Amino acid sequence: MQQKWKPHRRRVRAILFEPNPAEAARLRPTLPAWSEGLVVEHGLAEVAGAYTLNLAHWPGCTSLLASDPGVLAGYKIAPLYETVDRVNIECVRFDELHKAGKVPAPDVIKVDVEGYEHQVLTGFGDLLHGVIGIEAEAWFYPVFKGQKLLHDLVALLAPFSLHLRRIEAVPGFEGDLVCVNAYFTRGKAGHPDLTLEQQPKYALLQRVWGLNGI
């Protein structure tokens, strides 16, 4: 769980996805028993099936997509994206897991999968109609081959009435704005159409994400 959510952890049920069994086992004890949190041993994608995960020199740069040396050339961070190994993993669509009763419908989504965010969010399908907020890593330049960029996320989420509210720069590219955290919430102009159950959840995410007054 992100540090900013920890003060509110008693109001959050975290559903984490980790395709590596050893890493999933490490994560489970970090979820308090009372939270009903889950660690699901799957990757997420637009199409279910077997995928190759490119393990990068720096684990945080690992991706289902191959990095693009041409785009990364000239940045000191470039060597961290170099692939050092590859492993096969199974990926599923989130909406299929939900249909099978294995995960609850999401209220808020946090996705940071190194260039594969668009495909993961597509796999939520019509469940996005019930989502009140999304925090996604997003990109202005294609650091990974074939990746979608921020404007693609905006276009994907607009039909679900999820609108871009804020971006914050992700450091690492020596002053260039290459990667950001993008925050989307339901409704235009900060005036979402919410159910009574959603209203306190929306108020909480506004506070945690620092969107009050924006």
Task: For every predicted segment, state its role.
Residues 1-214:
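Phosphate/nucleotide-binding beta-alpha loop and adjacent structural elements of enzyme active sites
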